[in-house]
């Protein structure tokens, strides 16, 4: 069976990335495959690290640099112009008799869905930390995503050549902020010439990279007796002691040996591999991707410590098989697909192949209707399809939109082309919401942030040649009921000679657990027992659809449950009529109950020199912000942790640069919704109506 995992970039229409792992089809080479993702906070050096891997593996002839716009994995025009990763990209390269399939993912919060999709396709991840910043906001987010997928991981502490880098602080952050068990395999040291070198804990060697050949070669020299060696031996003993408490094979050797010095390096590495695969520890390595230090040893660690596809103790182990050009596949939804071509990916370049075995990452051309989360198999048996879908289908967690705006084509003749472009972009990016507003007659986009919406507009122009117009960005408020309400809706009509009649009694109540329930009180239960399951489903669907648009600003109604008391459906009444009556009843209830607005709240991390902090805090106070903490950040800077309403943060990046004279930086991400006072609610309503 073959499981869809992630879709490639915008230029590969109908080309899809697959993760094929092996239990049924055992292949001898599958133990030499590593499917990995690379994750990080924005600007931690993730793409630079990937480019160095490609260079040292012989896949590229020159070093790709983000600031020069010549990277392999950041190939979109928008990525090269902005110097950020927007779409996940796949690259494949050999390293020391292994094959590494790597997915380079975005670090910006607006594109977190790209990370979520990519993690379905990998067996382990490398998390890159900025050695000068430690664990940052998006680091915590991607770490949580990896936790959800139970992925083994390595840490690469980057930028350790910089004078303000702090390795010990990074390790402390891993323990405190990520609540993990880091095991340091390397420690930073400066050579006599002041250049970054690495002391290896397991081998007790010093590793020094050569500038003259762009870091292609490095020297590993056994440390002579010295303070450095003594400290490193203590670190090695601590590593053995920690691993022996987690691995029985190593523990048996430790018990029988006279000294930790006698423990073989290969035995330590095998124990570390097992502990990493079981997610008991996280190996920590270091280097400087930009200065070409430490990358080869990072790739060695990927081969040594991250699992092969067949070693994952996950549902992926049950997927296996072979995919060939021209193969016919069936989705769990019963749709047939034909694989017209197969490609081995290198970002936006491809090498066509005839077939691939389980464990490989490939791009498929020709799939017309496959979307994120689909399961494809070669079987056409309904029972097997149903069982496969139940056991293995992916259910991506799509984040709520925080902004929305209208989108208009340049002319009526471009409307269909725009709709097709949006449909394709949604297949690639499920966090993009597209809806039709029946009141205004406009197509409405929902997205994760200002940058997200800007990129969508840019891609429609560059990839589909449609110069669309976006309306002003609006905040994606939500609504919740003020008080419970109960009403009965009775409707009778004759449509095309057929009598349609529905009478239903519904109630809305405060509830966060489920959207729709039955009132099984003694007086209502006999009536509810007469309703067929299909009618109950129709009533549920119609009722819930009305919660998508609240009465005040058209926001989604949340923290609300619809309770069905009774229903009487006339013979021959169409399902669509029943559904519409249920929706009208809920809309009537929402108007009767009244709703309160909930506004999106953002969590910010702001770093600035200490002398600028008071001015920044004063400005935040005017923005209805809640200051959670102010922490030291290095010798001269401080970090402000703050929650603030999204509505107050329009243009805040520019404001921060002005207040801090260009010395401040910030990151922000959604952290939930909060109720509003009546004054702010009135202002939000006026903004939604275009009066502000």
UniProtKB/Swiss-Prot annotation:
Pfam families per the UniProt record, alphabetical: EFG_C, EFG_III, GTP_EFTU
NADP in keyword set: no
Coiled coil: none
Binding site for GTP: 40-47, 104-108, 158-161
InterPro entries xref list: EFG2, EFG_II, EFG_III, EFG_III/V, EFG_V, EFG_V-like, G_TR_CS, P-loop_NTPase
Task performed by this protein: Mitochondrial GTPase that mediates the disassembly of ribosomes from messenger RNA at the termination of mitochondrial protein biosynthesis. Not involved in the GTP-dependent ribosomal translocation step during translation elongation.
Alphabetized HAMAP family for the sequence: mEF_G_2
Name used for this protein in its record: Ribosome-releasing factor 2, mitochondrial
């Amino acid at each position: 069976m073959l499981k869809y995992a992630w879709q490639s970039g915008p230029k590969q229409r109908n080309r899809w990335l697959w993760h094929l792992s092996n239990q049924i089809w055992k292949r001898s080479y599958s133990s030499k495959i590593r499917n990995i993702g690379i994750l990080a906070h924005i600007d931690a050096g993730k793409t630079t690290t990937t480019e160095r891997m490609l260079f040292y593996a012989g896949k590229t002839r020159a070093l790709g640099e983000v600031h020069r716009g010549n990277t392999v994995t950041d190939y979109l025009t928008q990525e090269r112009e902005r110097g950020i990763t927007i779409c996940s990209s796949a690259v494949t390269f050999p390293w020391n008799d292994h094959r590494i399939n790597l997915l380079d993912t975005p670090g910006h919060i607006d594109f977190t869905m790209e990370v979520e999709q990519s993690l379905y396709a990998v067996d382990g991840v490398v998390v890159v930390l900025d050695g000068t910043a430690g664990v940052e906001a998006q680091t915590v987010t991607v770490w949580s995503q990896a936790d959800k997928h139970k992925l083994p991981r390595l840490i690469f502490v980057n930028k350790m050549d910089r004078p303000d880098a702090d390795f010990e602080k990074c390790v402390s952050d891993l323990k405190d902020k990520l609540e993990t068990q880091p095991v340091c395999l390397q420690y930073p040291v400066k050579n006599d010439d002041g250049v970054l070198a690495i002391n290896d804990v397991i081998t007790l060697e010093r590793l020094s990279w050569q500038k003259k050949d762009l870091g292609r070669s490095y020297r590993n020299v056994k440390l002579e007796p010295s303070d450095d060696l003594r400290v490193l031996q203590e670190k090695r003993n601590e590593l053995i002691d920690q691993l022996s408490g987690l691995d029985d094979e190593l523990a048996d050797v430790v018990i029988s040996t006279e000294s930790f010095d006698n423990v073989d390096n290969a035995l330590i590495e095998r124990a570390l591999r097992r502990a990493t695969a079981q997610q008991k520890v996280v190996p920590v390595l270091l280097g400087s991707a930009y200065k070409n230090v430490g990358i080869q040893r990072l790739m060695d660690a990927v081969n040594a410590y991250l699992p092969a596809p067949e070693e994952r103790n996950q549902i992926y182990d049950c997927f296996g098989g072979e995919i060939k050009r021209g193969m016919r596949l069936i989705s769990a939804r019963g749709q047939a697909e034909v694989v017209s071509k197969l490609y081995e990916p290198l970002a936006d370049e491809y090498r066509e192949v005839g077939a691939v075995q389980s464990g490989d990452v490939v791009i498929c051309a020709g799939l017309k209707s496959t979307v994120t989360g689909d399961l494809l198999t070669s079987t056409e048996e309904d029972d097997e399809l149903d069982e496969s879908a139940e056991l293995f289908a992916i259910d991506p967690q799509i984040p709520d939109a925080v902004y929305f705006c209208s989108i208009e084509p340049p002319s009526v003749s471009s409307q269909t082309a725009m709709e097709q472009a949006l449909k394709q972009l949604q297949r690639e990016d499920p966090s993009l919401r597209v809806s039709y507003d029946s009141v205004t007659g406009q197509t409405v986009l929902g997205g994760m942030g200002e940058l997200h919406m800007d990129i969508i507009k840019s891609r429609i122009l560059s990839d589909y040649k449609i110069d669309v117009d976006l309306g002003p960005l609006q905040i994606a408020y939500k609504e919740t009921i003020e008080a419970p309400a109960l009403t009965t809706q009775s409707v009778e009509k004759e449509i095309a000679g057929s009598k349609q009649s529905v009478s239903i009694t519904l109630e809305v109540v405060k509830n966060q657990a489920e959207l729709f329930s039955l009132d099984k009180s003694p007086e209502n239960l006999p009536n509810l027992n007469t309703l067929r399951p299909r009618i109950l489903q129709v009533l549920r669907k119609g009722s819930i659809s009305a919660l998508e648009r609240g009465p005040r600003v058209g926001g989604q109604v949340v923290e609300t449950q619809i309770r069905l008391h009774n229903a009487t459906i006339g013979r021959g009444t169409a399902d669509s009529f029943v559904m519409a009556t249920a929706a009208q009843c809920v809309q009537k209830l929402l108007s009767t109950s009244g709703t309160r607005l909930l506004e999106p709240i953002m969590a910010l991390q702001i770093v600035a020199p200490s002398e600028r902090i008071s001015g920044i805090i004063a400005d935040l106070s005017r923005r209805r912000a809640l200051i959670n903490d102010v922490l030291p950040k290095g010798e001269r800077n401080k970090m402000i942790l703050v929650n603030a309403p999204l509505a107050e943060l329009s243009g805040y990046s520019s404001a921060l640069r002005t207040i801090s004279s260009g010395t401040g930086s910030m990151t922000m991400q959604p952290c939930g919704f909060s109720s509003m006072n009546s004054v702010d609610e009135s202002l939000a309503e006026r903004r939604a109506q275009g009066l502000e």
